[in-house]
Amino acid sequence: MVTASARAAASSPGVRRGSVRSALSAPAIAAGVCVMNAVLPVSVAPATTPQVRVSTFQYAVPAIQLVRDDGKVVWLPQEMDDGRPVVLNFIFTTCSSVCPLMSQIFAQFQQKLGADRDKVHLMSISIDPEEDTPARLREYARKFHAGPEWQHYTGTVEASLAAQRAFGIYRGDKMSHAVVTLLRAAPGQPWRRIEGFVTPEELLTEYRHLVGAPRGSVASR
């Protein structure tokens, strides 16, 4: 079943390029209930065949302050504009369905980057900032063996909503948030938006394509 909000998101005028392809992720198949929350394209396959939609957007990073998991108050544009490619998702720590799968994908992607992992900035922004304190985010990050290149962020409710709206994530309720991963090669470049569950291998392929890295330059293990 495709909701009205899903249809609206799929037909957003900001899309410059889009494609739909089958996801190969076993967790996605096992978590059928989670896929219901993903932003699906208007034309979809049956629910038993999860889909991944890849599009390109020009997002404006909002000038908001967030609190990093180390307790430091930071400006989001500065965090994203440190020269590294950015891989971004939105989670909350008490989520028991979608978020653990998304974070596990990040964890495996981080491993597959190998020696190049410190060249990428992985970012997870909480959509439940009232509950997700920096201490809780640190505990959550440890569960997924997040390295120093993968940071988690909280802040005020207003700042979290501004970030969600800026990147087309906001769905009105944290329990129905979309399964979206966003990638950007460098400041000022367009964002690659991946809607739906993607395997760590597929995410690595998208990353390589985005930054123009030769296949052998990123460890795959």
Where on the chain are the PLM-derived regions?
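N-terminal secretory signal peptides that target proteins for export/translocation
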Residues: 1-20
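Thiol-based oxidoreductase modules, predominantly thioredoxin-like and allied folds used
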Residues: 119-132, 149-158
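Short, internal strand/loop/helix patches
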Residues: 139-178
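Conserved helix-turn-beta segment immediately C-terminal to the redox Cys motif
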Residues: 103-124
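A short beta-strand-turn-helix
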Residues: 65-85
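Thiol-/selenol-based redox modules, centered on thioredoxin-like
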Residues: 177-221
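Short active-site neighborhood of thiol/selenol oxidoreductases, capturing the structured segment around
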Residues: 79-99, 106
